Amino acid sequence: MSLHHTSPTPIAAAVLTQLAAIAGRWPSPKVRRLHIPRRPGEPGEHDAEFCAIELEDGAFGLSYILLGHTLDRLLAHHGSGRSDALADADPMALAQRLADGDEVERAVALAAVNALTDSVWRRVGYTPPPAGNSLGDVVLGPQDHLGMIGFFPPLVRRVDEAGGRLTVVEMNAGMVARQQERFPNILVTLDRAALAGCNTVVGTSTMLLNDSLDEMLAAAPAAQRFAVIGPSAGLWPDALFDRGVTLLGGTQVVDGAAFAAAMAAGESWSGASRKFAITRGSWPGWRQIAGL
């Protein structure tokens, strides 16, 4: 029996409606700055690059920026060395572009959504549960047929160790070719219909940027567990849980100065952050957390 639900409201609209309701109780601070990583040295050298919005209260929100030419355009518009990019901007206004913006606007919008979420969580004293493993508490056994949306090399090893089956759905042909070369024994495809037989699905939060989450949920009717994980998954989870997502695994920045320095230097910022995992069954709901 599928755990999925259907919702007529586009996910971006649901997220923005929720943010507006929360902002009535918890007005948002302005943007302190947009953090952009140093440009990758060679095409394909980095599989994951993120930008971050920092708010004046020290809250952070992350977003993936390797879709299309997002990174190039962000660098052209703001430059990784600019210390005042988007300073004093209204994060609620930036967030609105999640619904109808271009690839750059949507990336910045998701970072703003995540920063707004982090800001309220900090103010109300909510700390999301720590992730028990690097993949958002996803536990696998030999009976599992895992579907991956986007590529998680650590999960490939974990499936192999557990003796389970693995199907990978990628979102661009270039990544399919690269991953098939790296892992020739794994099915890597652009066809989301390949998820039909998977009982567990793990997808990157990039699905929020390219608006593919609802399509992927529909393509995996047998999935009893559907996790959305990654640094971009730092938002209130209600809209995702309403659709059938069972786990949200995100990243919180815990040392803003160290994070900013690492991103500016093109170094790993994992030591300045913590991974968390929120399950649908344990989530009390946004109204209770926000005191609404």
Feature-to-residue mapping (PLM):
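Short acidic low-complexity segments
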Residues: S134-L135, N185-G197
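Short, conserved loop/helix-junction motifs that constitute active-site signature segments
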Residues: L140-G141, V159-A162, L195-A196, A218-A223
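NAD(P)-binding Rossmann-fold cofactor-contacting core
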Residues: G164-Q179
